[in-house]
C-alpha cells in the first residue's frame, strides 16, 4: 500500500543521508555476492519477501542516483542507458570504491565519458560479455515482476 511504500522510501533516504550505507554489511555482502556468485545471488533474492526486495532495490537505486552529482563534472554520458549502466557498475564495485567516488577521493575523476571506461564497455559495441554487477538492481526488479506481475514501484515518486 502507499503508506508502506512511503515508509520504505523514507527508510532508504534516511539510510543514505545518515551514512548508514557505509556500515551496512548485509547490503554490501549481497552486492558482492551478485558480482562473484550470480546464481547464489538469485537464490538469495528469491528467498526475500516483498518488503526486503523493495528495500534492497531502492537502496541500490539511491546509491546509483547519488553518483550523478559526482559524475556531473565528467560531462554528458554517451546515452542515458550507458550512464545508468555505469552507475550500477560503480555501486557493484563495492563499498570502498563507492565511498571513494562519493567522497571525491577516487573513482571517476578524470574519466572522459566520450571514451569507454577501462574495463567497462559503455555502448556494448565490442560484443564483450557484460561485466558482473551491471544488472544487480535489475535482477531484483525482474524477480518482482515475475512474482507480482507488475513493475516494481518507482522510488523517485516517494523521495
Task: Tell me the role of every PLM-derived stretch.
Residues 13, 38, 42, 80-83, ...:
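Generic, low-specificity signal for short hydrophobic/alpha-helical stretches with a mild N-terminal bias
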Residues 95-159:
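Basic, alpha-helical nucleic-acid-binding regions used in initiation and control of genome expression
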Residues 43-119:
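Core of folded catalytic or high-affinity ligand/protein-binding domains
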Residues 31, 75-77, 140:
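Generic preference for hydrophobic/aromatic residues in regular secondary structure cores
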Residues 2-69:
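N-terminal domain-onset segments
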Amino acid at each position: 500500500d502507499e503508506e508502506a511504500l512511503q515508509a520504505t522510501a523514507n527508510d532508504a533516504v534516511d539510510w543514505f543521508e545518515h551514512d548508514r550505507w557505509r556500515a551496512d554489511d548485509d547490503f554490501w555482502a549481497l552486492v558482492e555476492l551478485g558480482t562473484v556468485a550470480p546464481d547464489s545471488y538469485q537464490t538469495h533474492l528469491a528467498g526475500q519477501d516483498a518488503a526486503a526486495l523493495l528495500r534492497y532495490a531502492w537502496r541500490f537505486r539511491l546509491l546509483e542516483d547519488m553518483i550523478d552529482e559526482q559524475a556531473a563534472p565528467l560531462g554528458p554520458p554517451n546515452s542515458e542507458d550507458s550512464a545508468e549502466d555505469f552507475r550500477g557498475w560503480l555501486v557493484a564495485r563495492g563499498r570502498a570504491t563507492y565511498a571513494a567516488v562519493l567522497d571525491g577521493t577516487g573513482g571517476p575523476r578524470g574519466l572522459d565519458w566520450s571514451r569507454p571506461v577501462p574495463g567497462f564497455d559503455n555502448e556494448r559495441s565490442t560484443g564483450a560479455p557484460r561485466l558482473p554487477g551491471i544488472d544487480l538492481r535489475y535482477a531484483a526488479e525482474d524477480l518482482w515482476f515475475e512474482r507480482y506481475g507488475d513493475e516494481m514501484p518507482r522510488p523517485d515518486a516517494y523521495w
